[in-house]
Amino acid sequence: MRVQVGEDKETLEEVFDGRTLTTVMHLLNRGRLRELQGAVKSGKESRIYRGIDMKGGDVAVKIYLTSSAIFRQGRLKYIRGDPRFKDIPHDTRSLIDQWASKEFKNLQLAKEAGLAVPTPIYVEKNVLLMEFIGKNGVPAPHLREVPLQAASSWYDKIVEMLQDLY
């Protein structure tokens, strides 16, 4: 087992606090991951890393930033009033862990409904493992990154998927 990280120190400290490092080490030690490689996508609330599973296949490792005030500001409105969050302490780490769990469950529901979403694999604390969408470690582009002609052909598919989900 090995961990490869090619980011600068600031990014490492932002993503890999002691608790998150412990969680990643648990995933490696329990055979959920064989390797954790570099970041493939970065956002305000999380980073997505390429991971290698025990069979040598790619997996996406989404790590929610535990120190992010942006997370608390941006997601609190979705948590208030949701019965799944009523018994969760409202400290940032607990909310982030619950948000990762909620995303895992929503991906399961969407997959069961036959939607084209990454297959959720496992969630622990603020770390979510899911199917890697891409080839040879290169993630598939977001819809906003696809040429307009190609993106427009997806519109009807997206509307249909939303109807299937709801």
What are these regions, as identified by a protein language model?
Residues Q4, L12-P139, Q163:
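Conserved ATP-binding subdomain of kinase catalytic cores across diverse folds
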Residues G137-L148:
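AlphaC helix of the protein kinase catalytic domain
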Residues Q149-Y166:
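Conserved kinase catalytic-core segment
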